[in-house]
């Protein structure tokens, strides 16, 4: 057999191995089903208050790009409400975002919009975890890129 065949075979095995590793053992492998054993509280009870959050932003390779603290103030009724966030990053930069959130009939899912979000974000609570996906338009000072964001929020006592 030719050397080219073995090179292609080796690359195929390597790529397949990396994809398997990523799907099974990386932080991207988690799903909401992983948190289903805990009781699922009502979204308005979880989000409809003032709370503090700490977070980490990862790049596409899984490396930490930034850390932040956030103050989050929610005001909700049975249909939805607003979530005001103020982020203070390790660099000292400050960002603010106001989400408009609409609860869906299943009681666990929601849609969300914000001025710097393209279209609608989608979220769901299961057990003590909330997962939300959306497309974020970065400000020009940060390059103006559009990011596909997957936010995980973990509820602590």
Language model feature labels by segment:
Residues 47, 53-154:
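Central antiparallel beta-sheet cores of small beta-barrel/beta-sandwich binding domains
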Residues 1-63:
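Amphipathic/hydrophobic helical signal segments and adjacent flexible N-terminal regions
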């Amino acid at each position: 057999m030719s050397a080219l065949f073995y090179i292609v075979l080796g690359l195929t095995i390597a790529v397949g191995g990396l994809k398997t590793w990523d799907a099974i053992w990386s932080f991207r492998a988690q799903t909401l089903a992983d948190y289903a054993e805990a009781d699922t509280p009502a979204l308005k009870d979880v989000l409809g208050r003032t709370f503090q959050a700490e977070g980490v932003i990862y790049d596409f390779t899984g490396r930490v790009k930034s850390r932040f603290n956030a103050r989050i103030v929610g005001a909700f009724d049975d249909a939805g409400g607003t979530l005001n966030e103020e982020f203070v990053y390790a660099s000292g930069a400050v960002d603010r975002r106001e989400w408009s959130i609409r609860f869906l009939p299943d009681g666990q899912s929601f849609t969300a919009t914000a001025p710097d979000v393209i279209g609608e974000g989608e979220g769901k609570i299961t057990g003590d975890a909330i997962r939300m996906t959306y497309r974020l338009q970065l400000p020009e000072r940060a390059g103006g890129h559009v990011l596909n964001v997957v936010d995980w929020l973990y509820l602590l006592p």
